[in-house]
Amino acid sequence: MSTLICSFDGLHDNRVLRYYADFEAHILHMDTQTEAGEKVSVHFTGLLAHWFENVVQDNILFGMDEISVDAFFEQYKDLLGGAISYGFPACCSIEELRDRMDREHIRVDSSLGLCGFVLAQEVELQCP
């Protein structure tokens, strides 16, 4: 079974201009710019959690992929094992988190370059 569900090719090598999370509205918004100077926005809704590392000015996205729930738990098992008892990414056990992700169809998207993940129900790319 493939762990890759979908690749978002329109983000390859885009520079991250800004991102913000609104926890009350359950959204995460990221503005990026292509090498040609075109703006591409990524809008996540139904936000459960996000985790990014190596965040610096002028991060470049290698890409963004939606991966299976099983692949997510395999890729981030060490992070989850150490953080779940502190309420991240959700105040529940790993088994309850997996059930919730299956039940709510939470999408799993990971970006490379700016490494990490976003757990959200929907994602939309907006190109002006």
Give the location of each predicted region.
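Surface-exposed, interaction-prone regions used to assemble/regulate multi-protein complexes
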Residues: 1-128
